[in-house]
Amino acid sequence: MRTERTSFLLALGLLVSGFCSRVHCLPENVTPEEQHKGTSVDGHSLASSNTDFALSLYKQLALKDPNKNVIFSPLSISIALAFLSLGAHDHTVTEILEGLKFNLTETPETEIHQGFQHLLQTFNQPSNQLQLSVGNAMFASEELKLLDKFRKDAEAFYASEVLSTNFKDSEAAVKLINEYVKNKTHGKIEKLFNDLDVLTNLILLNYIFFKAQWKTPFNPNHTYESEFHVSQNERVIVPMMTLYLETPYFRDEELGCTLVELTYTSNDSALFILPDEGKMQDLEAKLTPETLTRWRSSLQPRLIHRLRLPRFSISSHYQLKDILSQLGIKKIFTSDAGFSGITDDHKLAVSHVIHKAVLDVGEEGTEGAAVTAVVMATSSLLHTLTVSFNRPFLLSIFCKETQSIIFWGKVTNPKEA
């Protein structure tokens, strides 16, 4: 007998469509607040898993189109998928959380949700030095009856609000969601959806907005037009920012790359990674969480007499279904998906996972949105040092307090928005 399918969307994005089974959320006799009081969450473990997932996802995105810019928020995608797992059970929840690189024998499911709860609370603390807001929302069909437990867990762990939505009026639903996203990302992402499937029943959405000022800003008067080597055969003219400063620096001879860390007034940072010419793919293949840890511990203050960095604005729009499947998160897209912890009157499965991100880097600082370390080196004064990011490079926007990668990307052509 054929089962009618409905659609459920995770927009970070994640887009989901109909199926069922019993969903495990949290033990019935324990509230999220009681569990949060009783258990200490290992923030390092959460950060380590998020970093592992970020690099695994990046390698798949880079492999898909090696010569294109890449920008995404691994944190947004991790939060959205963890949020989804609240309503999953058995093999479905295991597949999601293991796909996010969690070891469930070492970190129980409830501790993972507590970890994300703490992360969200930390990110959303008011600050004069940093604009960082991270949040979740559910756009639920007027006919869909969400289970009380899922509603409560979603609010307690992921601070998710619920917005009743008439998906039968697709145009109005698209307008509602796009305006919500535009507002939450301060206009950086104006449109997440052009249209919606008629079977859409539920949208789980995660957004991130980040804006920070450099501790040592670039002088706009020193920005000039310069060549950027996209490839051996292609060059483009870009606005090249320049700066004289002392900042954390590391030259990795083993992997053939140069690293420069620029800090924000909030003490969060951007790490720029410049592979030697022709070494980008070799470096990408060797990226591991251990590599990032080694780099951060190796950074030393160094006087850079001339740092050259292009001013750029890049964006992305990814359909992540195939890539997540390659990372082991497959069941959520099939009729075997178990999401009866969300509702008991619809069968749900994920139909799409959508992620959109925008990142601007300029003289004053960095602005981005997504929806899914030191000892003075005495040798620094022995010779002048120039570092020119005039060829493809990697970047990581990093929150030091939570040890989280907020954005990860690759700039192959600063002229391509």
UniProtKB/Swiss-Prot annotation:
Positions annotated with a glycan in the UniProt record: 103, 183, 221, 267
Name of this chain's protein: Serpin A3-7
Cellular component, GO, one term: chromaffin granule
A Pfam family annotated for this UniProt entry: Serpin
Range of residues in the leader sequence: 1-25
CDD domains recorded: serpinA3_A1AC
Subcellular locations according to the entry: Cytoplasmic vesicle, Secretory vesicle, Chromaffin granule; Secreted
Single GO MF descriptor: serine-type endopeptidase inhibitor activity
Keyword annotations of the record: Cytoplasmic vesicle, Glycoprotein, Protease inhibitor, Secreted, Serine protease inhibitor, Signal
Function, in words: Serine protease inhibitor.
Subunit field text: Homodimer.
Record-stated family: Belongs to the serpin family.
